[in-house]
Amino acid sequence: MTNNKNYMKFLKFYNKKNKIKKIKNCSYKKLFCMNHYLRTGSNKRKKFLKKQYISTISVKKRLKCAWPKLINCSNFIIKDKKNIPLIKSYPKINRTSIAPTPWVIDSIFSFLKKFFFKKQNSKILSKNKKKKYLEKWEIVGIIRRYVFLILILSQTSIATYKLNSILPYKDISWSYTIYLFNKNIFLIIKYFSPYILQIFVLILFYILFFWVSASFWTAFMGFYQLITKKDEYNISNKSIVKEIKKNHRTAILMPICNEDVERVFAGLRATYESILSTGKIKFFDIYILSDSYNTDICMSEQKSWIDLCSETGFIGNIFYRRRNRRVKQKSGNIDDFCRRWGKNYSYMVILDADSIMSGKCLVKLVSLMESNPRAGIIQSIPKASGMNTLYARYHQFSTRVYGPLFTAGMHFWQLGESHYWGHNAIIRIKPFIKYCVLSPLPGNGIFSGSILSHDFVEAALMRRAGWSVWIAYDIPGSYEEPPPNLLDELKRDRRWCHGNLMNFRLFFMNGLHPVHRVVFLTGVMSYLSAPLWFAFLILSTILQIIYNIEFMCCFKINSYFYIIPYLHLEASIGLFFITLLLLLLPKFFSVILIISKNSIQYGGTRCFILSIILEIFLSMMFSPIKMMFHTFFIFRAFFGFSLSWKSPKRRDFSTSWKESIKSHIVQVVIGLIWSFLIIFFMTIKSLFIFFPIIFSLIISPLISVYSSYVKIGLIFKNFGLLLIPEEKYPPKEIINTKKYFKINKNKSLKNGFFQAILHPVYNALAVAMASSRHNSSILIDLNRKKFLDLILIKGLNKLNMIEKLTVLNDPIILTKLHFIYLLNNQ
């Protein structure tokens, strides 16, 4: 950083006497002698040929220009076998042998056989085993789930029976069928097609109403739990160990891949300082586990890590490692940590790139693990906050208001057989290593290979092994950020959709707990419900058109309700409002809860109620668009379209008109065709039934663009609408994250790969953190020379991703390129 003038003078002087092609063949020692000449102006070369002296005065002196205190720490920089400087960015490896268990998946017939003959099978299996007694919470959970199922089935059956009584096609005239059979078989098809269509409508309605009913009863029991505060089986209410055992240490893992570096390290620093304030920092280590392959981001990560260590007062508990082989993506990154350092820790907390957790929350999770020795995973509930676009504000408001209701309800039905969401959760490492390492799904095609939505599967395997999985729904201090706009959320949804479809292959997995089979099923249904809703609406429209054509001469249908004969108007209105009530009651429960406690956090009662109305309106606008996209995702997956996953945006990015029109043009066309069919074949009044859906599809590009604007989001914020407690009374961790994010942006490293070659300090950092540390070999040296020739011919700008990573990983190539390119430029 300093003595740049001397540096340039030296380069200019040296360039006159030496050719560039000769420099690439210079030895590592000679180049560092040149570098020492730059710093000191000394020409006593023999003195600097000593190995130890050279490595100390070259890389270390350059690094001292930027991070003097940190570089002076003992054992921060060591030397490898070839005396090349090496920064100890991670601890000594303490390897554990881990291996994934091959999948044993039953066929449907063998699964049904085991299910129906469970008693006989259990008698055979338990001859030489001790009888397992169920814990109290397990018995209570079984009873609750049977009640849950009875409530849903009864409610759904009544609603379907009502719909059947409303639909027009009921009695089949068999005598007329025989008459038609003698005439023409096509007349029979024409006669029976409305009845077959109506059966499909009833089946779809039963499935979809079952889904709505399950959601309602989950919200209802969550409301009961939160309003009474009498949850005997809430894991966070149990007796908690006050002191953590000294040998029970926790690793906080942040797996990242090409993320927004400034935001990642801002959140990490806020989390670290929050732990520091609890006085329990000695029980925690932080690991940044990078899978990044963008070399600019890789270099920025290294700089941000060393900055973080320097700013927090380096005490040797913040580590950084970047993998060279990206096997199994995020789950493989965590497996790699467990293999290398899992022995050193009792627990690990997984964070996402946008996660923030308070020190109190982390200490509480560790204490819960200490108090519940059979708990394998405890999931905290991350609260969405931190974005300002209209869509993000809508998203974080709805999850903040309705989320507690549904998570408490899920806990009521699942208890210790719950699932985990892949981040902001604590995991017991030993059983995780033993039972939860995932092998790729067998076979070919897009539903085979590495599992994408690994979190649900890991929770299922943990429970299968006899360890409980809990949701700690009432622990504060866990945060994440929502997607900034609609299209970004849909990109994330596509990956989740694909992952849930892959997971469903494990539905018949041997030994899986019934609750986790249901979790896999609900995971699929959360996306499959979209095409089912779409099919239900389309078939209902077709059925109404057929009915209108057939009975146009008999009487005029004068109704606002589709597939409803005029004579059944009262029954249809009743069913319509019952369905609407089931959809809106969870929102009403949330309103009661918040107003009864403290609505000031949401801007006061008046602003809160207006925000609820606004949220309902926005949901009506966004839901049809999501329905169409989820339908496309399902079809794309089944037709074999591959999926490429990129890290989501972590800032308030708006959607461009070009991107919006390109993404939504299909929905616009479908909306226009749908409205034309209704107007042409039905009545204009019938259009009002479908109006919210069709109108949303037609104007979807406008919705997508305007909902991504920060200005519109801030206007609502200034009026006190869509406020959440984290905005009204922001916790210290969120305040610090925003503060450090601004600081990080001001000192962010741009064009990191070129800086690693050209800039003296960043080159020294890249050299000291390069991972390719091979012993001397003629073949390696020869390949290195060939690669340097290739770089000089192609130029840095034209190197591909793999070539750039090769450069960044090799300390000798980095050193030679540093001198070659600077001399060439001068």
Curated annotation (Swiss-Prot):
Bilayer topology annotation: Multi-pass membrane protein
Keyword hit for Cell inner membrane: yes
Keywords: Cell inner membrane, Cell membrane, Glycosyltransferase, Membrane, Transferase, Transmembrane, Transmembrane helix
Family: Belongs to the glycosyltransferase 2 family. OpgH subfamily.
EC number of this enzyme: 2.4.1.-
Organism encoding this protein: Wigglesworthia glossinidia brevipalpis
UniProt cross-references to Pfam families, sorted A to Z: Glycos_transf_2
Cell compartment(s), UniProt: Cell inner membrane
Gene3D superfamilies in alphabetical order: Spore Coat Polysaccharide Biosynthesis Protein SpsA, Chain A (3.90.550.10)
Main location: membrane
Function comment: Involved in the biosynthesis of osmoregulated periplasmic glucans (OPGs).
Annotated GO MF terms: hexosyltransferase activity
Pathway: Glycan metabolism; osmoregulated periplasmic glucan (OPG) biosynthesis
UniProt-recorded name of the protein: Glucans biosynthesis glucosyltransferase H
Keyword Transferase attributed: yes
Gene Ontology CC: plasma membrane
GO biological process, one term: glucan biosynthetic process
Positions of transmembrane segments: 137-159, 174-192, 199-221, 518-540, 547-569, 573-595, 602-624, 628-645, 665-684, 688-710
InterPro entries: Glucans_biosynth_gluTrFase_H, Glyco_trans_2-like, Glycosyltr_2/OpgH_subfam, Nucleotide-diphossugar_trans
